[in-house]
Structures are given as C-alpha cells and as structure tokens.
Amino acid sequence: MLPEISRSMLKNALVLGLFAIGTVGSVALLQQGTATRIAAAEREAQVRALAEILPAGSYDNHLLDNRIELNAPELGHRSPQSAYLALKGEQPSALILPVTAPDGYSGAIHLLVGIFADGRLAGVRVLGHRETPGLGDKIELAKSDWIRSFEGKSLSDPNEDGWAVKKDRGEFDQFAGATITPRAVVKAVHGALRYFDKHRAQLLGLAEDEQ
C-alpha cells in the first residue's frame, strides 16, 4: 500500500510541478508581451509628440533613432537629456531640444523646442507642468494657441528686448491673471535659441565650412 501511495504522491507532485512551470511560463510570456506592447505604445506617443513640433515634409528620418545626448544646464537640466536631430535628404534640417523652465508659478515647466537649422523656431510644446488650471495652463496647445506664437521666431526676430511678455515691454502676450507662467516659458525658449546658436555646428554635426 505504501509504495502505491508514494507513487501516487510522486505522480501528483510531478503534475503539480509541470502545471506550475507551465503557469510561470505563461505569465512570463504574458508579461513580456504586455511590456512589448507598452514600449510600442510609448514609442508611438513619443513619435506623435515630436511630429507635432516639426512641419510635415521638413524631415524624412525617424527622430527617435537620431538622438543626441546633452548635458546642458543652460537648458534647465540637472541630468543628461536627449535631443532629436531631424534630417532631410541626409542633411540636418532641424533639432528638437528638451528644455526646462525652472521658474513657473507652481514649479518647473518642461518643454520641447524645435529649431530649424537656420535658427528659426519650428514649434514649441509643453510636456509637463503644474500651473494653475484656467490660468497658467493656457501654455498647453489644448487650452489656447498661445504656444504657437513662437513659430517662425528667432534670435533676431524679435530683437533682444522683444523676448519678453508685453507687461515687461516685450512682444509676447501674457495671460489675464497669470504673468509668471508665460514669462518663464518665453525666457526658456529664448535661452534655447541662444544655446542652439552657440552650439549649432556641434549639435547639427556640421563641418567648419558648413557653419
């Protein structure tokens, strides 16, 4: 009787063991599949966000595959960040810089700033902020078109004094009841243009005779 019981217990143990292995394997495959889908969704979201900044037809490469690692405190970074180089016919056409405005009303404002190779602004988008709903959040494109007022601007258009909100005798509108937020964004975008102008050849990978 005991040998029969032992064989039965062993058989049950083997069955349970195989079931457990199969279950673990299935869970692992499911987790791997889920992680793959999440990664793909995140990549697609990044592609869409970057594509909003540059006009269609201004580049023909995959932006996420052309990253430039930056260590740039001038752009408000405390750690290395990724910029994205746009190419057209294998020539640099624009660069998207990650920029942080540290002096928003409620904290840091995180931006993406697209700059054409000739130094004109292609576009600016807000990645994240904690500004006051109904006031400072008008920096979001979903809330107003204010962020589009940067498009086509450059270091020389407007001039140095013009890179400020109108309350500070500059060219850019502020919001009713909220001046600090747009002031911080204008300052950060202007800083991004200065950084690009200073490091243009290095950022775009140009030889000296192409500068």
Swiss-Prot record:
**Keyword check for Cell inner membrane:** yes
GO cellular component: a single term: plasma membrane
Q: Which residues carry this modification: FMN phosphoryl threonine?
A: T179
GO molecular function list: electron transfer activity; FMN binding
Q: What are the recorded Gene Ontology BP terms?
A: electron transport chain
Q: Which InterPro entries does the record associate with it? A: FMN-bd, Ion_transpt_RnfG/RsxG
Location in the cell:
Cell inner membrane
The residue range of the signal peptide is none
Keywords in UniProt for this one?
Cell inner membrane, Cell membrane, Electron transport, Flavoprotein, FMN, Membrane, Phosphoprotein, Translocase, Transmembrane, Transmembrane helix, Transport
The transmembrane segments are 13-33
Membrane disposition: Single-pass membrane protein
Give the first-level EC class, as a single word: translocase
**Cofactor annotation:** FMN
Q: What is its EC number?
A: 7.-.-.-
Subunit relationships: The complex is composed of six subunits: RnfA, RnfB, RnfC, RnfD, RnfE and RnfG.
Q: Which family does it belong to?
A: Belongs to the RnfG family.
- Describe its function: Part of a membrane-bound complex that couples electron transfer with translocation of ions across the membrane.
- What is this protein's record name? Ion-translocating oxidoreductase complex subunit G
Upper classification of the organism: Bacteria, Pseudomonadati, Pseudomonadota, Gammaproteobacteria, Pseudomonadales
This chain is encoded by the gene named rnfG
